[in-house]
Design a protein with these regions (language model features):
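Topology signature of small-to-medium multi-pass alpha-helical membrane proteins
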Residues: 1-144
């Protein structure tokens, strides 16, 4: 890709999608951490899911925070065309990965999540896509 100082159109599209995606994650994190009962009801969480969530160790909540807030920061850095976007997206992925390991290997998270467990796979795939995209833009000289 020839870099002429302007951002390619897809950088803005991917950056905006990343910001919206991770922005929702930040909103969900905030609403969940502040124990908004109306949010739990709106999300359709069952009593068993709330019990599972309330029993999660604090390190999983920290990993979740790193995942969502790191993803939002990565999106902003991507829109600013900064190479640090790649590193921040990797840290965000590691936050997601820590939570996924707990949910799928160290607890009965898959059972507790019910039909929502595939969403974790979608989130992980989105993280990997944003890493790949930032890496590609970095290698082609779009990110500085």
């Amino acid at each position: 890709m020839k870099v002429d100082g302007r951002s390619p159109w897809h950088l803005w599209a991917v950056g905006l999608i990343a910001l919206l995606w991770n922005g929702f994650g930040c909103f969900d994190y905030t609403m969940t951490q502040t124990r908004r009962e109306d949010w739990f009801a709106q999300m359709g969480m069952t009593a068993a899911q709330l019990e599972y969530f309330n029993a999660m160790p604090s390190w999983t909540h920290a990993a979740w925070a790193i995942g969502v807030w790191g993803g939002a920061l990565g999106a902003v850095l991507l829109l600013m065309r900064r190479k640090w976007a790649l590193h921040v997206f990797v840290v965000s992925f590691l936050g997601w990965l820590a939570g996924a390991v707990y949910a799928f290997a160290l607890s009965d998270g898959m059972e507790a999540m019910g039909s929502m467990w595939p969403m974790q796979v979608v989130i992980g795939a989105a993280c990997l896509f944003f890493i790949w995209y930032a890496w590609t833009m970095s290698k082609t000289g779009v990110l500085r």
